[in-house]
């Protein structure tokens, strides 16, 4: 059974979020085939690539199936997930918060949260990495030693990915000059010399504009030894190396390897099977109608669904869909079953754990002890081929973050 949050806290969080009825109007009451006609999906803010992709899908499904879908936006992970957990939203396209909420880690290790029973519904891939100006003299990650490196404000998950990138080059945070900057402020900071590198989606208006003004280079993260990827599993378990082309600053035919991961559509585990089955079937059926509407929407194709690293379970209706498409495997089922067992044991242990730790003055202490408890008491998850170490996966670029 999925855990429920403190109702007052969740309703307050949900009430503070804008619901954009203009994306797809609500005319209400009846149900479309396979589930609810009126749906709310939470996601990133208006103007982000993530929002634009989801709006394209929502509008297409409204026009083709009669589903009335509204998008609810938030700039924070908790703001995107709280409406999903309390039932205000039925689906959410999230950042890495889906993983941390499933595990009950970081800010989700709290009275209001704890581990959540979330499921993957659709997982389009995306590519992200660090870039530099070509006139910087920086050609590899190792060349970042002594340079000004961004420490993103209020972006713990991305900072962990950037630490993993440094580790790939044999560096740590002590080998660079850390500069506090917001995610959106990185491009201007690079232009003015406040930082020497930045972390970014490989496509998007902002990075394309930067590349048109200053020739840029994506630092390659491919072809490494297992040792170079040794910390990726702990720091960024949802990430693997992925080759991309057609990214900002790349010449025709040029490719590079950076981090590949999904900004997925997720639902609660108890979302009705028939509804999810109908939804994913329609996302596949009407893919030709929305695939060219944004620069990234083509990555929503069923043949491009990202399957690894698998860090939370797929919804059972999506597993059936992937089986029909010939994309499911014995290794994936083994991993899926292990994640379901991990979820069961976390949910079983959480109430007693929190009772013993809720009064600690420093919330970070409880967070660390929860991670330590899991390491000591839960079996290691089985690996799936094609994840780490060293094996790259090829994809065209996709969107994700703002």
Regions found by a protein language model. Name each.
Residues 96-98, 104-109, 136, 174-275:
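Pocket-lining segment of extracytoplasmic ligand-binding domains
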Residues 202, 206-218, 274, 284-402:
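An extracytoplasmic/periplasmic, membrane-proximal ligand-sensing/linker region
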């Amino acid at each position: 059974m999925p855990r429920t949050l403190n109702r007052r806290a969740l309703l307050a969080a949900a009430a503070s979020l804008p619901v954009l009825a203009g994306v797809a109007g609500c005319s209400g009451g009846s149900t479309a085939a396979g589930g609810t006609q009126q749906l709310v999906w939470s996601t990133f803010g208006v103007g982000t690539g993530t929002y634009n992709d989801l709006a394209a899908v929502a509008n297409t499904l409204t026009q083709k199936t009669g589903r009335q879908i509204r998008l609810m936006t938030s700039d924070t992970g908790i703001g995107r997930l709280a409406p999903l957990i309390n039932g205000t939203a039925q689906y959410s396209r999230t950042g890495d918060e889906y993983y941390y909420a499933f595990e009950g880690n970081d800010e989700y290790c709290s009275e209001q949260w704890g581990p959540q029973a979330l499921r993957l519904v659709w997982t389009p891939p995306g590519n992200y990495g660090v870039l530099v100006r070509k006139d910087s003299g920086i050609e590899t990650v190792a060349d970042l030693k002594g340079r000004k490196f961004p420490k993103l404000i209020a972006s713990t998950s991305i900072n962990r990915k950037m630490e993993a990138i440094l580790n790939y080059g044999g560096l740590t945070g002590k080998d660079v000059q850390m500069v506090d900057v917001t995610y959106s402020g990185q491009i201007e900071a690079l232009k003015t010399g406040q930082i020497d590198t930045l972390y970014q989606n490989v496509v998007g208006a902002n990075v394309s504009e930067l590349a048109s003004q200053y020739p840029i280079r994506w630092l390659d993260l491919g072809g490494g030894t297992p040792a170079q990827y040794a910390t990726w599993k702990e720091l960024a378990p949802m990430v693997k190396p992925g080759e991309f082309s057609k990214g900002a600053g790349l010449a025709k035919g040029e490719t590079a390897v950076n981090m590949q991961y999904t900004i997925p559509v997720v639902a609660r585990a108890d979302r009705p099977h028939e509804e999810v089955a109908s939804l994913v079937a329609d996302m596949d059926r009407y893919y030709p109608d929305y695939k060219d509407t944004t620069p990234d929407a083509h990555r929503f194709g069923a043949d491009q669904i990202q399957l690894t690293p698998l860090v939370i379970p797929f919804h059972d209706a999506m597993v059936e869909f992937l089986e029909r498409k010939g994309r499911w495997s014995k290794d994936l089922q083994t991993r899926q079953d292990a994640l379901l067992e991990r979820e069961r044991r976390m949910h079983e242990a959480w109430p007693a754990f929190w009772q013993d730790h809720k009064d600690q003055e420093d919330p970070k202490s409880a967070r660390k002890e929860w991670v330590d408890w899991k390491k000591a008491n839960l079996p290691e998850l089985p690996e799936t081929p094609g994840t780490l170490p060293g094996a790259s996966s090829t994809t065209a670029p996709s969107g994700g973050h703002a």
